[in-house]
Amino acid sequence: MIVSRFAAPLVAVCTLLGLTLIAEPVLAEPYLAVANGFKCAQCHTNPTGGGKRNVFGMTYARTQLARRTVLSDEASPGWNSSVNKWLGIGGDYRGGYSDVDVPRRSDDSQAGVTKSTVYVEVKAVPDILTFYFDEQVSPGNSLGRERYALWTPARGKYTVKAGQFFLPYGLRLQDDTAFVRQRSGINFDTPDDGVELGLELPKWSAQLAATNGTAGGGSEPGKDQTSLSATYIQPRWRVGASYNLNDDPRGDRTMYALFGGWNTGPIAWLAELDLITDDVPGFGSRDIYATLVEGNWRFGTGHNLKATYEFLDPSDAASEDEQERYSVVWEHSPIQFLQTRVGFRAYNGVPGLPLTNRDEFFAELHVYF
């Protein structure tokens, strides 16, 4: 049964507040940053997260995420993404099997490469000027995701990024099919061209980006996009907000996001609430609501159990069009830089639209370096 239009967003907000009140002390994906009190830049070359992992990120993955570490030479520190002081490289491979069960249709099963990417970091002036490249090499033709110059003066207190990059907005989730990433249109498939200014303080991380609004689709006269995101970070919790305005002659889109993360014992929580308003000349405006609440339980070395609830109201002008999605994913890292994922997702949507009521099962192999 689908909850009422406003009940689910209210549940998400209450969950955000509730987690803040019940949080207790505790000794690429955002939950790892939340669990450890890190910023995105702690583990990634990109200050806003995603893509290539830096030396610390690779060392953390090897020593903290893997069930055991395998080294040919026990005295060796192992691979850390750095070729030398001037060059760093990395990559991600994801592939496996998926099965989609849509009511009144035959099952759709397939196996293959989900996504394969390579990263190159050229440190022209170490710790000050970097040229960064993120290229998707499969499936299909090669696709440039990020290509930018990064200037980090004052020991990284300020950041200036120019080129093509992922926009700063909401949680940097690995799953691009999450409602908050899919409906906002800001995810790993939609980089944009422009300039981003960043500020990194001990407890704050903030970014302001001015881009041309293409999201990988080519420039339009009179079109531009502005993105603003800020996060306040504490060792056991964080809260942030984002704003995005896509100014387009064919219709403007304005988006607001409230997001955060909390630790409650062994579980790291993530939550996000998005309000999206589309204004189309001649058709008026419509509001879209999307939410996510996710818990990650690292119940043993090398093991993580992820459970997610999501709600989507694709249009406040229509009734009975709400959708829900429930996900359970087990992630296992038997050795360093190798992860297996097995998951199930159940969609609960509009009775007359079978695709919004589908079930998905997947098994994935993730290799990174």
Predicted regions and their residues:
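Outer membrane beta-barrel
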Residues: 33, 51-53, 82-99, 105-213, ...
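The canonical Cys-X-X-Cys-His
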Residues: 38-47
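Outer-membrane beta-barrel "beta-signal"
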Residues: 39, 332, 357-369
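Hydrophobic, lipid-facing positions within transmembrane beta-strands of outer-membrane proteins
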Residues: 70-75, 87, 114-118, 145-147, ...
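Sequence/structural signature of outer-membrane beta-barrel proteins
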Residues: 96-103, 136-140, 167-171, 176, ...
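Detector for outer-membrane/organellar transmembrane beta-barrel domains
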Residues: 228-316
